[in-house]
């Protein structure tokens, strides 16, 4: 089923974490950029502040990011943990085709806080909600294209060196890193579901 005929519910069900991927993708760079662009344009944000930001790293820039993650993590994590957990996973992510860095503009958030002081204290939390929706939208669209995708969090190790490498504006706060490529292996862990009845309440129906 193509992305054009996939229903929204089917796309939501299809979305999952796939970590074992390669850089041998059939999707065009233009299509990847279109997906991220549409996500940024249409994902909701508090008071329509449009604070969501993204940096798309492909091919060698993608690999450079994971080289940065390797060196930054090695310098910050105890050697046993780095060698057992960090290094193998970073190597796995480096083998992918691309990484999307998701940011939130602190200037955009502070602008709303200045205009509407009563919501200023809530803006950081709402910003996290907004960024999560942007990440989810892009993740779902990439999976609908047949890509394997996973969401990673290597902050704060990578924040400063990545900002320096790609000249990221100072007010952009890094939230997550989305790795994608051609699926080449099974999920590291199959999806399981707790009973919905224990997680949902309905009144008045």
Range-by-range predicted roles:
Residues 64-66, 108-112, 187:
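Short acidic/glycine-rich loop or secondary-structure boundary segments that cap or lie
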Residues 99-103:
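Active-site-flanking beta-strand signature of metal-NTP-handling nucleotidyl enzymes
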Residues 72-73, 167-170:
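Short, hinge-like loop/turn segments at secondary-structure boundaries
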Residues 70-71, 113-122, 192-193:
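Short, surface-exposed, charged loop/turn segments at secondary-structure junctions
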Residues 1-98, 204-205:
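N-terminal amphipathic, basic helical "cap/leader" segment at the start of enzyme domains
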Residues 56-58, 104, 182:
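A general secondary-structure junction signal
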Residues 39-40, 106, 115-164:
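Small-aliphatic-rich amphipathic alpha-helix that forms the alpha element of a beta-alpha
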Residues 3-4, 8-12, 16-19, 173-205:
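C-terminal helix-cap and adjacent tail motif
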